[in-house]
Amino acid sequence: MKRALTLFSFGAMMAFASAQVLANGNIENGKQKAATCFACHGADGNSVDPQYPRLAGQYNAYLVQVLHEYKDGQRNNAIMKGMDATLSDQDIEDIAAYFSSLPTKLDTLKGHVQGD
């Protein structure tokens, strides 16, 4: 019984923490702000081109971190640097909330992209 109560408490705590991560961004605002992302990453966040990562279903915190890294120059990509330059912290939170709320497609991407 103690074990079940402990597991239930842990599960409830994790659900609350997950909701808090999503609470920082507004999904509807993110959808509008992400319109420029659709050309490369797809309108549903599931890019069909293997050189652009799928954003749908990614962890919210990961997307926020990556967008900040592009904006701050910690990640070097000319396209993303230009796309990210004018985003505010709230824009980043909203865009991350939008893409993380979308279902991902688990089919195999066609083609192969060479790494650096």
Predicted feature locations:
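Bacterial N-terminal signal peptides that target proteins for export
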Residues: 1-9
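A broad, structure-centric signal for solvent-exposed, well-ordered loop/edge residues
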Residues: 8, 47, 62, 87-90
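Hydrophobic alpha-helical targeting segments used for export or membrane insertion
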Residues: 10-14
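Flexible coil segments in periplasmic/lumen-exposed cytochrome c-class electron-transfer proteins
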Residues: 24-34, 43, 75-116
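Amphipathic alpha-helical segments that mediate coupling or scaffolding at interfaces
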Residues: 66, 70, 83-86
